[in-house]
Amino acid sequence: MKGVFALILTAALLLGASAAAEKRKVEPLLLPMPLYNQHDYAEPVFTWHERDVTVEESGCGAACVAMVVGYFEPDDAPEPDDVMSLAGELGLYRGDGLGRDALRLLLDEYGVEGRWRKMDAQAIENTLRKGYPIVEYVGAGYFTENGHYVVLRGITEDGKLLVADPNSEEKTTQKTYRFATMIQQGKGDYPFMICEKEDVPVETAQKESAQRSAKRK
């Protein structure tokens, strides 16, 4: 009985610690970037095998690339349809959106280095606090019925993630997410792409991007 009681007590302590951690106050962080909704881009960008290709239908990856580039280069930021057009020119479109390698190559075209990685909560937080946005490839679940891209863009005071979802304004502006939730939503062995631009100081990028966001308001 003592052993059973000890197990119950340990479980209760762990649950209490988990709840306390969930409520802990942390330094909030926001990486200011343009927030694009792919449904605002319904016009055909190019034709693939006699079918019109639009950002609205298959451009979540292009929208995420545009948001990341807009964060680093606020004065020279492409829009999602510009990115999708470039994908077509480079032959990166394969009929059902853009693959992970395509996103990495598109970022490279804009001078941003993307590296797909497996990440735990601490690695995600450390990366964001360095000023590097993270593109995540999510599988079937909360965000999508199949495959989808979102951008991790900040941390709230209560230790949750801010996410830019190009498929949903509500999930972008009105929702926050536990680290464990986003890790669980990731699809594949390496679902997180760290985005860096070495020749642009992070502080400068954040300041200029914030100024541009303020002007848009």
What are these regions (language model features)?
Residues 113-164, 168:
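Active-site-adjacent substructure of cysteine-protease-like catalytic cores
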Residues 55, 67, 74-76, 90-93, ...:
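Solvent-exposed loop/turn segments at secondary-structure junctions
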Residues 2-21:
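Sec-dependent N-terminal signal peptides of Gram-positive bacterial secreted proteins and lipoproteins
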Residues 56, 61-68, 79, 83, ...:
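Stable alpha-helical elements in mature extracytoplasmic
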Residues 18-92, 140, 207-208, 213-216:
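Active-site-adjacent structural segments surrounding the nucleophilic cysteine of cysteine proteases
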Residues 15, 138, 154, 194-195:
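Hydrophobic side chains in beta-strands
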Residues 78, 83-119, 129:
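Mid-length scaffold segments of soluble, non-membrane domains
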Residues 24-28, 33-37, 155-217:
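Noncatalytic regulatory segments and standalone regulatory/sensor domains
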